[in-house]
């Protein structure tokens, strides 16, 4: 039987499972002043031949920019970062196998969006004013969805796979909230000295038939708004990666590819470069975090604007979940489609989308509700 603390990763496309149990130590930063010492401890653990797995909350991104650092609130109920230090992955992954699966609909109840359509229209209107004034040209406006959770997170994790298989499933149970993530988006992977990121920007609802799906995909590939949204984030990530990549190695091997999931089609591009030698964990995160696909562009100004418009901190949502290997390889997902499960039975997940000049409030709100289906299924949101 699997008992906390542990971290479980699953790639639903291959069925591969990686499990980490019994951490030697925990590296946790709740306060801003603990954050950079925690990153230094992570670097030291990696240098000592250890694995690290866990998460970094979205608000940690403020600390990499002096101008944004004051935006980190002192009263946080979720750590800025939380990582376990492990000797190796667990040899026995069977202990993470599911017992009898549940109906995923039974896991969450009393599901309520943080904003009504009317609330959303008001915040959208304020953001659109910034777009009109040229303060930013894209921003990823998000809202929380609150619920109650029941039962066992591990069983729920396996039960939700059927609803939406993804490459970057994760269950992080390291104390504090349990993080159940069904992310389809790679934030970055470092392998053999190369870094690659797969920004996902552009979403459309699945069709009712294969023929309709094919039609929708063709339409998506021709839609100027979708292409512009994706291109903006590709340019932003090219800029971010160039800060830690060797000159002349930056490449976009894939542009505007469509990935299909049970409820949506998503547009994805790939950006890669050869890492400069001796890059630390801090160097990589300082250049890239948080992912441009969940902030906007220009990144810093978009983050300021979103801080003023959104309800409270995003916490783990839109942060990063992943692992760091002793050989320098790393892999982190963007923590979208991610539910935080609190001890008092409360659950929170967020939904959002990129807003550009020709976006409309009602269509974007509908997209938010569509993205919530990974957790809600066909349940109506109250």
Positions of PLM-derived features:
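Extended alpha-helical targeting/anchoring segments
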Residues: 1-382
């Amino acid at each position: 039987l699997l008992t906390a603390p542990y971290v479980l990763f699953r790639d639903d496309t291959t069925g591969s499972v990686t499990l980490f149990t019994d951490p030697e130590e925990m590296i946790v930063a709740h306060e801003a002043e603990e954050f950079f010492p925690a990153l230094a401890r992570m670097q030291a653990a990696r240098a000592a031949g250890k694995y690290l797995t866990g998460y970094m909350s979205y608000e940690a991104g403020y600390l990499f920019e002096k101008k944004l650092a004051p935006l980190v609130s002192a009263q946080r109920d979720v750590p800025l970062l939380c990582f376990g230090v492990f000797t190796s992955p667990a040899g026995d992954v069977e202990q993470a196998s599911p017992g009898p699966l549940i109906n995923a609909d039974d896991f969450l109840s009393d599901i309520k969006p943080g904003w009504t359509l009317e609330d959303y229209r008001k915040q959208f209107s304020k953001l659109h004013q910034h777009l009109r004034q040229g303060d930013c040209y894209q921003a990823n406006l998000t809202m929380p969805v609150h619920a109650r959770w029941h039962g066992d997170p591990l069983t729920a994790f396996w039960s939700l796979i059927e609803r939406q298989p993804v490459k970057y499933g994760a269950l992080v149970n390291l104390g504090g909230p349990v993080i159940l993530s069904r992310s389809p988006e790679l934030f970055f992977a470092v392998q053999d000295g190369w870094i690659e990121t797969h920004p996902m920007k552009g979403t459309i609802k699945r069709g009712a038939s294969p023929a309709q799906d094919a039609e929708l995909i063709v339409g998506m590939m021709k839609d100027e708004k979708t292409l512009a949204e994706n291109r903006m984030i590709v340019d932003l990530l090219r800029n971010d990666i160039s800060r830690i990549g060797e000159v002349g190695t930056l490449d976009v091997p894939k542009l505007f590819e469509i990935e299909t999931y049970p409820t949506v089609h998503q547009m994805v591009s790939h950006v890669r470069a050869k890492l400069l030698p001796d890059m630390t964990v801090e160097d990589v995160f300082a250049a890239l975090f948080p992912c441009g696909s969940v902030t906007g562009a220009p990144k810093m100004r978009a983050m300021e604007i979103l801080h003023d418009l959104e309800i409270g901190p995003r916490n783990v949502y839109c942060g990063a979940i992943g692992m760091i290997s002793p050989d320098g390889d790393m892999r982190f997902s963007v923590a979208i489609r991610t539910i935080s499960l609190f001890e008092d039975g409360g659950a929170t997940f967020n939904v959002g989308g990129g807003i550009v000049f020709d976006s409309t409030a009602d269509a974007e709100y509908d997209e938010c509700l569509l993205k919530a289906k990974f957790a809600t299924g066909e349940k109506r949101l109250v």
